[in-house]
Amino acid sequence: MSNGTIVQCIGAVVDIQFPRDNMPKIYEALTLVDEGSSFAEKGLTLEVQQQLGDGVVRTIALGSSDGLRRGMQVAGTGAPISVPVGHGTLGRIMDVLGRPIDEAGPIASDEKRAIHQPAPRFDELSPSVELLETGIKVIDLVCPFAKGGKVGLFGGAGVGKTVNMMELINNIAKQHSGLSVFAGVGERTREGNDFYHEMEESNVLDKVAMVFGQMNEPPGNRLRVALTGLTMAEKFRDEGRDILFFVDNIYRYTLAGTEVSALLGRMPSAVGYQPTLAEEMGVLQERITSTKTGSITSIQAVYVPADDLTDPSPATTFQHLDSTVVLSRDIAALGIYPAVDPLDSSSRQLDPQVVGEEHYQVARGVQQTLQRYKELRDIIAILGMDELSPEDKQAVARARKIQRFLSQPFYVAEVFTGSPGKYVSLAETIRGFKMIVDGECDALPEQAFYMVGTIDEAFEKAKKLQ
């Protein structure tokens, strides 16, 4: 292991001169040994990104570069960033380097793994068609999740990605007796704090490992924190377990890559993103997969800049997912939560051979009715309901009931809404929507379907409204 000297600092990018015959490899971790400034973070870790030649390497600082100056000494570690893995990580909050940030002492783990790992080989993969029930009607009906699959929650600012993610954690992680890993990538510290207390109150903290790289941290931390969380999840998977891996938010991972790319002097591509966008996304997503030994079911929140799904970042994420749950601002504006768009959301599992003929027909019937209502909306706005044919009037009435029945009170939002959360089984969800589509609820007022769980609750609410 050789020592080097800092020759240039530009923000998070630091150039270091090493002896020509002993340069560190790409992705090797380096540590600051010279504490020549009271500002500089002790033992600051830097990751090699480029070899510029003549003994100079370009690195990204995984921490604040405040207080760094030319001439400071840096030592090579001879290995990539390695983080603790295994049972010692459960119930703990760690940073990108696997250091504890919950003030609960050191992490009791004997094994460390490098955060850069190859994706499983093609012959090791194991596709799954087993459904994962979430208890959220709109998701179970229109875009069902597969165990060991990848799910994306797409939405702009403030339409409920994190609340939906928390509800899924509440419904799946608490029911699912397995282990979970949560990677907070560039999100608000407050949300990480809320998540920790939520897990603590529900007594599942000892089954969750948490890794956070928040908004206020340098781009190097935000770029690598998803890999840190994934490395911990992979260890559990390789032990033969079924793991839940939550990432909030994949867009911030891309954004950190954009910041790093610009600092490294690469030419930007479309909309200012890094030219390696597809490759960086692929490196992460190809590792989030299920093998013959165990499975990783991943649920990822994806911020959609300016509500534009064609933006390169969400568009690149789409192709890696099995289910896409699209949250719509228009639906949120109607006061319908979860604000999932049933016409935009899709799933590979929505196939009669996987979900069964009845589920498939009911889901398609719901989508057809809503699509017809969408087509008629302009006519209604101009001419009013009276100009519609009886069939269209009936379709509109049913669509409005379906739209309201797709809403549901959440457990995690009880404190805000005052109404208790509801978990609806898949069988109840199918039965309820089948009754509406078949016209068995035509006599009920549409208000009866708003914010209820099962169809029986809608009938009870209708009696109270009369």
UniProtKB/Swiss-Prot annotation:
Keywords: ATP synthesis, ATP-binding, Cell inner membrane, Cell membrane, CF(1), Hydrogen ion transport, Ion transport, Membrane, Nucleotide-binding, Translocase, Transport. Belongs to the ATPase alpha/beta chains family. Its EC number is 7.1.2.2. SUPFAM superfamilies: C-terminal domain of alpha and beta subunits of F1 ATP synthase, N-terminal domain of alpha and beta subunits of F1 ATP synthase, P-loop containing nucleoside triphosphate hydrolases. It is found in: Cell inner membrane. It comes from the Bacteria. GO terms for molecular function: ATP binding; ATP hydrolysis activity; proton-transporting ATP synthase activity, rotational mechanism. HAMAP family: ATP_synth_beta_bact. The keyword Cytoplasm does not apply. Its main location: membrane. This is ATP synthase subunit beta. Disulfide bonds: none annotated. F-type ATPases have 2 components, CF(1) - the catalytic core - and CF(0) - the membrane proton channel. CF(1) has five subunits: alpha(3), beta(3), gamma(1), delta(1), epsilon(1). CF(0) has three main subunits: a(1), b(2) and c(9-12). The alpha and beta chains form an alternating ring which encloses part of the gamma chain. CF(1) is attached to CF(0) by a central stalk formed by the gamma and epsilon chains, while a peripheral stalk is formed by the delta and b chains. The keyword Translocase applies. It catalyses: ATP + H2O + 4 H(+)(in) = ADP + phosphate + 5 H(+)(out). GO terms for cellular component: plasma membrane; proton-transporting ATP synthase complex.
